[in-house]
């Protein structure tokens, strides 16, 4: 379960960072 959670986070974090900072 933790492995899947980390895998999802690695995909979500860059997208959120991109949306917030407008740096893509």
Curated annotation (Swiss-Prot):
**What residues form the membrane-spanning segments?**
none
Q: Which family does it belong to?
A: Belongs to the frog skin active peptide (FSAP) family. Brevinin subfamily.
Q: What does this protein do?
A: Has antibacterial activity against the Gram-positive bacterium S.aureus ATCC 25923 (MIC=3 uM) and the Gram-negative bacterium E.coli ATCC 25726 (MIC=24 uM).
Alphabetical keyword list: Amphibian defense peptide, Antibiotic, Antimicrobial, Disulfide bond, Secreted
Species of origin reads: Pulchrana picturata (Malaysian fire frog)
Q: Name one Pfam family in it.
A: Antimicrobial_1
Where does it localize? Secreted
- What is any one of the record's Gene Ontology cellular component terms? extracellular region
The SS bond pairs are 18-24
Tissue expression profile of the protein: Expressed by the skin glands.
An example Gene Ontology biological process: defense response to bacterium
What is this protein called in UniProt? Brevinin-1PTa
């Amino acid at each position: 379960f933790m492995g899947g959670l980390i895998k999802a986070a690695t995909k979500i974090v860059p997208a959120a960072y991109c949306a917030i900072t407008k740096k893509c």
